[in-house]
Amino acid sequence: NIEEKDSAGRETKLRLSLQDFNDGVAAVSYPYFGGVEHAHFTPAKFSDILERNVPVKQLTLADGKTWAVATVYDLLLAQYGVDRGFGGGNVAKNYDEDVPGTPAWQEKITGVPRAAVIGVAREFADTAAKTRGRSMIIVGAGMNHWFHNDMNYRGLINMLVMCGCVGQTGGGWAHYVGQEKLRPQTGWQPLAFGLDWSKPPRQMNGTSFFYFMSDQWRYEKLDVQDILSPLADPEKFSASQADLNVQAIRMGWLPSAPQLNRNPLHIAQAAEAVGKSAADYVVNELKNGALDFAYADPDAPENFPRAMFIWRSNLLGSSGKGHEYMLRHLLGTRHGLQGKDLGERGAQKPEEVRWRDEAPEGKLDLLVTLDFRMCTTALYSDIVLPTATWYEKDDLNTSDMHPFIHPLSKAVDPAWESRSDWDIFKGVAKTVSEMAEGVLGVEKDVVLVPILHDTPNELAMPLGVSDWKKGECEPIPGKTMPTIVTVERDYPNLYKKFTSLGPLLDAQGNGGKGMNWNTQDEVNFLGKLNHRVLDAGVSSNRPRIDSAIDAAEVILHLAPETNGHVAVKAWKSLGEFTGRDHTHLAVGKAHEAIRFRDIQAQPRKIISSPIWSGLEDEHVSYNACYTNVHELIPWRTLTGRQQFYQDHAWMIAFGEGFMQYRPPVDTKTIAPLLNKRSNGNKEMVLNWITPHQKWGIHSTYSDNLLMQTLSRGGPIVWLSEDDARSAGIEDNDWIELFNVNGAIAARAVVSQRVMPGMVMMYHAQERILNTPGSEITGTRGGIHNSVTRVVLKPTHMIGGYAQLAYGFNYYGTCGTNRDEFVIVRKMNKVDWLEQETTR
């Protein structure tokens, strides 16, 4: 727990600063990035290394050496440039001094008057002081779309922490990203990943997957040196982002799928043949070079992703950054890609990722999409499995916008050949089981698992970064490389396992976030509620999961958020870690268990659970970190507290030990095309912004008549009156937007609400209707992601270091696009490409 007590249990007062208790001051060097030149953003020129004085204490270590130590608080204030009387330069006595960190300094970069910044900051802090922290920041995902998104977020969090707002009702951090909060998470996971029958699951971070498998890495323009700290050793980071991602996979920081350059079933067989465990065999084969990670050679045919199922995602019409790269390299179809790869440009190639001169086009053999409408992804698919819509199926719905569990209730049968999602996957499982006979039996599968957050080995590399392939350490599964686990796959019985609740919940219980509790009572109840399987075989007498409602009941009964008895057990499990009793947070609802029929009658409010850091209480509105502050539950971090400072070696190397201003990166996508292929109209360069969809929900229903009427009936892009005037563009003109990543053809919406310098396209406007051809590509105009490309940030690859460790949908690489720019010009000819298709 985080009680203020010493090791003997005595009350103590923790020292925040050494301002009045020090052995002198030391000059500390801080990296500065605000002076980085950018064609479209204003720099503030200062030395790229700033020295500031910090108070220190001298500590004598066991070996007799003396070290100077400082508190994080003192280092933080020095980072902000606050003059506290310790002498030295690069500090400010008032807000008007032009020193990095002051309101005057930021005014040069942002154009926001310093008086406005000072006013808002004072009002925010004053409100927090008067109300005990009831100042709140509500933020959407827009800030998360910049390359240095984590620096943006850390800036907000720092302000909240310093004002005492975190974990206070009515204050703190309210992050909104849409209908994305999976509240009954621990009930859903066994069902979603088959954890009731076999563990661990094979999971992957999507951003790295598509970066490699759609060959976006071959076109990388951002040099790692461009974002490295001036205090770092550049020779240690001579590699590319692709290389660093492969290193992260090799050290167990990030997952990989495909994993190795051999079939994992064959690896298990080979290990058995030589009498070794799979772990020993894989380690030995990796060391002698007979085996390698798939991502070290992503263009080798044996490492292609051959089949892909897309469900609950419009990958090719909405979410997939680097759309044209996916069309070319993943699908092997027509594309609008204009850029040259590293080989064609004669640029430096990756050091650890094998380069093949001939880039593959069409890695996928099979693309299957489940959707209830013919979206862009469905149009590109080999097979489309029509799914039921909201009123044709039974399902669960939760959100971060309210604390209720909602049902989707089947009012009518699915139309025509469509089926519910559950029935489709149930049918796939049945067909696979039938086809497996004589081909695949009970097989052993070798699964590589990264070093996961909230597990005992999450602190696998506490004393720096060691790469076994470079000879810096031995390859030790679960410590210096991924954990290697053999999992049994019973293919002929896949259907029986899919339609029943497996025995691992009886034997191992359930849990989440590092906690675990017994679930035998819940399994027994589900056997009575859903009835038990009567057929002979592996699932005999197990609780049945035949229908979508059966599946919903499993989720509801296993999750502490919807079963009070489980919630009490979960809080008790947490108490075993903290040494404090937390069961009072749920004991009043111990006999409350939400059934599917309950939420059909009325949406039900969830129960407080230790899976989340806020409370669902009649007197406390949900607030992130409320239980950390009021129940003294440690944050799941290296220190157990909120951290201003991150001391991981890569964080330091990239200048992100502390939060600081990082300007947008230069994606270098404009120069190769600007004024090079003119159509006679003026070309201008604008910042590419893609807000949340205006006339629909993500990619749903934006193509019906009502929505199209509201949005002018086809793709539209918004730009300012000033920019439109300078380029001779009038409202409703057809314009083209392009860079080396691809091109878009759309109509212009000229608006005074848009700031000069930016151009805005609401996301998920698909290319399925009223989309003419692009003049520059000769193919149909693209979607909002046609002009973007995935650019990985190395610090998002860190693992094995407490909170800096991979977790499914928690931490890993992410795609960004706000740093991107496009060339905008008026179109001369609008070609609808209506000529007959020739084969």
Would you name each region that the model predicts?
Residues 353, 364-366, 372-373, 411-433, ...:
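Phosphate/diphosphate-binding loops
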Residues 1-131:
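Long, well-ordered, tryptophan-enriched scaffold segments
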Residues 376-408:
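Flexible glycine/proline-rich, aromatic-decorated loop/lid segments
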Residues 105-109, 139-146, 178-180, 314-315, ...:
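Conserved short loop/turn motifs at secondary-structure junctions
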Residues 123-124, 140-142, 172-183, 442-457, ...:
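A glycine-rich phosphate-binding loop feature that marks nucleotide/adenosyl-phosphate handling sites
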Residues 66-79, 84, 161-380, 484-727:
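Extended redox/cofactor-interaction regions of prokaryotic respiratory oxidoreductases
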Residues 131-136, 167-174, 340-341, 438-445:
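Flexible, glycine/charged-enriched surface loops at secondary-structure junctions
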Residues 276, 423-486, 507, 550, ...:
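Long, contiguous, secondary-structure-rich segments that constitute the structural scaffold
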